[in-house]
Every structure is written in C-alpha cells, then in structure tokens.
C-alpha cells in the first residue's frame, strides 16, 4: 500500500512546501497556505499534467489526511471559548450561520446552481471557509472542480471582507466589542477574521477570534445535517450506506470535549495546530491536482454570483443582529 501512495504523497508534499513558502512572501501573506496550495495544485495539473503513478497518493491525501486534520482541528477549540462571548454572542453567531446556510441553499436552487456546489458555498460562507468546504464535501461528495470553485469564491469574498470591514467600522458606529463580534460572525476564513479583527484593536481581535471559533464548533452538527440530507436524496428512496454521522465528526466532537476538560500543554496545542494546517494544506493541494480548469469554466458565473450574494447576506444579517439585538 505505502509503496503505491508514496509518489503522490511526495508530489502533494512538494506543492504544500511551495504554498507555505509563498505564504511568507510579501503580498501573499493575505492568503492561507491552504488557498495557495489549491492554486499551485491546479497550475501544476493543468500545465504539466498529473502523473498516473501519483493518483493513489493524491487520493490518500484528499481523503484520509483531510479527515484526520478535521479531527485535530478540535484541539483549537474549547467549550469555554464559546461561553466567553456570552449567550447573546452565541445566539448571534448561531442565527447568522443558520440563516446564511438556508439563504444560500435556497438562492442556489432558485438560480440553478448545482445542489452539491451550493451546499459547499453555503458551508464555506456560513462556517469557516475552506475547512468547512473540505469537511462538507466528505458527505456531499461533490466533484473536485466544485470544491475548487467553492474555495476560490469563498477566498475572494472573504478577502474583500477582511480588507473592507475594518474601514466600515467607524461609519457604522461599531465599538471594538461590536466590530469583533460582527467580524467573527460574518467573515469566512479564520485567518481572515484574525486579520480584520486585530486591525481594529486588541479587544476587537480577541472577540472576533472567539466568535469565529464558536462558528467552527458548529461544523459538526452542520456536517451531520448534510449527511442526513444526502441520505434522503439517494435515488429510489433508498438510504445510502454512508452513516449520518461520519467517524471523523464524532472524533472531532470528542477532541473538543477532551480539550475542554483536560489542560493540554501549550506546546502540544501549537504542534497540533501546525499539523492540522499542514494536513489541510496537503488535502487541498491534492484537490487542486485533480481539478480541471475546463470543468471550472463550464460552471459559469452563477455559482460566483451565489457566493457574492451569500457574502452580502451574512455581512448584512449579522450586522443587523449586532447593532439592534
């Protein structure tokens, strides 16, 4: 088995190394290594072609490594973090997440966006960007091109939010607490939330980070819900063999609980965070290696329009809640 996957793992690791190196270059620091890995993988695949002998290792990275990375993500979360923003903050985050997800799925159906792609865009917008798209795709089983399209669109509008929202704070009359809650409840990627939050002050950055991590804790119930939806959508009315709660979701919940009950040394948490980022980056590099640009073009602009509308909705909906609730 290992001999068969080594060539693909080496290729994925090389692209991952390029992504991390590029992330440290001025001008690219705005983008996470995960996003850069998708782009690098696509460029490699569509310019040079993906070798046949690397397919097994690429598939291993895309499936098993990604699942394990989602589990390790639990070491970055505790229930205490959720409690720290208060019941009102948790309510705003939960309401924004649920409303955005339903809005995006509904609008996607109305404008003719493929159901699976709409679900990926909905998850990426409402929860935590690329990580949510990856986790969601394990139960939706969309095409690699759909995953790449969703990641690209979420990255685009998340970057717009990261750069633009801090500039709007004074005009909207938001203090540091309110802005942090708004940024954490609405901006797509964790790194983008941190970037936007700390532009407005330390308190704002800390609240934004906690609010965002609260959204991440809702990844597990969202994946379970999508798993149940996928079972109902199977042909002939028969249930799919895939369980409604994948093993990695149960493991993710268990790790969050463990991290909440047991004091994990800071050095261990730091190592786990790095390992999580590396494995997520490898998984997205693998997806980029299997993405066909011609297939992306065939999707047209409707999914991009859907992502834009979802971006506007989550920003406006959460702002109203922060200002008036």
UniProtKB/Swiss-Prot annotation:
Broad class of the protein's primary localization:
membrane
Q: Which InterPro entries match?
A: UPF0324_pro (IPR018383)
Q: Where are the transmembrane segments?
A: 5-22, 26-48, 65-87, 91-113, 120-142, 147-169, 213-230, 245-264, 271-293, 303-322
Q: Does the keyword Chloroplast apply?
A: no
Any one GO CC term of the record: plasma membrane
Subcellular localization(s) per the UniProt record? Cell membrane
Q: Which UniProt keywords apply?
A: Cell membrane, Membrane, Transmembrane, Transmembrane helix
Query: Which residue stretches, if any, does this entry annotate as coiled coil?
Result: none
> Which cysteine residues pair off into disulfide bonds?
none
Q: How does it sit in the membrane?
A: Multi-pass membrane protein
**UniProt cross-references to Pfam families, sorted A to Z:** Cons_hypoth698
Family classification: Belongs to the UPF0324 family.
List the protein's name. UPF0324 membrane protein mlr2225
Instruction: Record the organism.
Output: Mesorhizobium japonicum (strain LMG 29417 / CECT 9101 / MAFF 303099) (Mesorhizobium loti (strain MAFF 303099))
């Amino acid at each position: 088995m290992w001999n068969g996957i080594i060539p693909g793992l080496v290729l994925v690791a090389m692209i991952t190394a390029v992504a991390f190196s590029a992330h440290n270059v001025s001008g690219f620091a705005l983008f996470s290594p995960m996003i850069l890995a998708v782009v690098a993988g696509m460029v490699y695949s569509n310019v040079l072609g993906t070798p046949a002998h690397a397919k097994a290792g690429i598939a291993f990275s895309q499936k098993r490594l990604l699942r394990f990375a989602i589990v390790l993500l639990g070491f970055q979360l505790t229930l205490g973090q959720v409690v720290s923003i208060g019941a009102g903050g948790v309510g705003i985050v939960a309401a924004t997440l649920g409303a955005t997800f339903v809005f995006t799925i509904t609008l996607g159906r109305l404008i003719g966006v493929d159901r699976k792609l709409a679900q990926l865009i909905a998850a990426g917008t409402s929860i935590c960007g690329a990580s949510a798209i990856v986790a969601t795709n394990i139960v939706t089983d969309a095409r690699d091109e759909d995953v790449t399209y969703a990641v690209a669109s979420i990255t685009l509008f998340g970057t717009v939010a990261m750069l633009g929202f801090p500039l709007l704070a004074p005009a909207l009359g938001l203090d540091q607490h309110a802005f942090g809650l708004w940024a954490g409840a609405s901006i797509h990627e964790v790194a983008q939330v941190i970037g936007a939050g700390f532009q407005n002050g330390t308190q704002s950055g800390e609240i934004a980070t906690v609010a965002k991590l609260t959204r991440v804790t809702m990844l597990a119930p969202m994946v379970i819900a999508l798993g149940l939806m996928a079972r109902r959508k199977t042909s002939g009315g028969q249930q799919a063999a895939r369980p409604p709660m994948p093993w990695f979701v149960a493991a993710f919940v268990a790790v969050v609980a463990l991290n909440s009950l047991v004091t994990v040394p800071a050095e261990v948490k730091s190592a786990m965070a790095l390992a999580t980022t590396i494995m997520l980056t490898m998984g997205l590099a693998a997806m980029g290696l299997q993405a066909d640009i011609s297939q992306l073009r065939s999707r047209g602009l409707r999914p991009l329009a859907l992502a834009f509308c979802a971006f506007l909705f989550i920003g406006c909906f959460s702002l109203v809640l922060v200002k008036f609730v």
